[in-house]
Amino acid sequence: MIPALFGLGCILGGLLSPQCLGILLIYFALTVAYSLYVKKVVLLDVILLAGLYTIRIMAGSAAVGIWPSYWLLAFSMFLFLSLALVKRYSELVIMRSLEGKQAKARGYEMTDGELLATMGTASGYLAVLVLALYITSGTAQVLYGRHQLMWFLCPLLLYWISHIWLIAHRGRMHGDPLVFATKDPTSRVLIFLMLAIAVSAV
């Protein structure tokens, strides 16, 4: 079943564009590498996870014939790295509550929790910095008629990233943070507000 789906995906990707096919092949190779080996390698696993999410954006853009801007790629890389780290951090918190201070989760030890939280929040805030720099760039001023409105995105995104990490720190994050965001009322409101601002700024 999986080989058939992979073959179908390659055919569809090739029909869309050679770039799309190339990105799909790279994504497949990295996904296999992650499943077989990388997911057990501390730190490399979260970096590759963030990269895979970013490659999805590239694949979607290639499918419609629009190459994503470097602003978007930088923003998504930092944001998804933060989310990958919060997932590992939340796993550590849950394992600690079940097995105590000697517990491990995917190679990470309990003593790694503080470091993961520091790296994760820093990565999330770097995504906000990239967004702020983009808003001040000439590109944003050309694409958005009311680009000043986009400044409201920064505090909202800061709040959401901080909220996600606070939830994880309290041991209430279970599973994928993106799935959590679709169920969390606070995240829903913040995402709706950010989408509304982005649309209004056009």
Where are these regions (language model features)?
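A C-terminal functional module that forms or caps the active site or interfaces directly
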Residues: 126-182
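Multi-pass membrane catalytic core of lipid/isoprenoid biosynthesis enzymes
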Residues: 1-24, 70-81, 117-124, 185-202
